[in-house]
Amino acid sequence: LNLTDLQRSLLDYRRNLYRPTPMQTVVDWAEASLRLTQRQTEHPGPFSTSVRPYTREPMECWKDPTVYEVTLCWGSQTSKTTTLMAGLAWLIANEPSPALWLMPTESLARSFSKSRWLPMLEDSPAMLECYPAEADKITNLEQNFTRSTLTFVGSNSPANLASRPVRVLIADEVDKFAEATAREADALDLAEQRLKSFSSSKAFMTSTPTVVEGRIWQRFLRGDQRRYYLPCPHCREYIKLEWRQVTWDDAKAEDGKHDLGKIRASAHYVCQLCQGKITDSHKVAALRHGQWRPENPNAMPGVRSYHLSSLYSPDRKCTWGYLAVSFLEAKASMAGLQGFINGNLAEPWEQQDVQQERTETSATVTV
């Protein structure tokens, strides 16, 4: 991105418009400073957490000096990557530090940087003031801002991690990282070694889980295991969403197959405390009043871990009906069922504990 002297002067003039106040939160700054366009989202405009309020607390971990490790074990369509992008943008603008974004492969890292990360910066005036005058200092993999640096690396190229002291590490989709070999050390281990030069370092781990022994599930277990609780619109008690509480009407077409249209229309959530019927609109409203609650009192101080299934997503592909149909289609095969459990429920796969025989009107699945 080439900036003329006039553009640079105008950006300097606007600096105070985006300068954070001491009491400004990460979320406040992001919502005032970042813009998403059609290149990143189907809902372009100013960055906002209003539809996905569960992203707010994890975002504040970027500023919280008592937190040094954050794990997001989240399902699909939950905005975990956008949440990380907003937090990293805040860091670059407000606490300039060397940072590393580690992804499964270098080609994926390059594509992500080019198609999602850099467009967000270029569309946000507050971030343009962090750009250097020399355009060649910002590439897809190496980005030297005016006061900070960011490097994108693939886990399949661990040699690129050598001699890179960083204060902040983002390890994205860690369960898809390349395994260590006799010739190459584990990329995640190497990346974490790079944090030792900074006493205020932070590490953010994200992924949908795969198996119990996988990286993200083990990281979640060692943290304080936070889960998002919502108020039931009927009894007002706080509950965490569980797949077994999703139900639908038994509906078959003339050929004996599932009538997916009727199933999608009838699916709803049943409160596990009062048995009240919770609709999709109820869920969206309840999200605004949700609370993250830690469930592991034995976690080390400063080690946060958040679990969030796609049940919480307000996305149209995560309605009760859409997920019910996805489940019925997926359970026809073990591979499909594992994909549903990992991707939508954000739970690890344990084949020996899976019960494939279920009633046709229940979402019961034991993992």
What would you call each of these model-derived segments?
Residues 2-367:
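Phosphate/NTP-binding elements of NTP-utilizing enzymes
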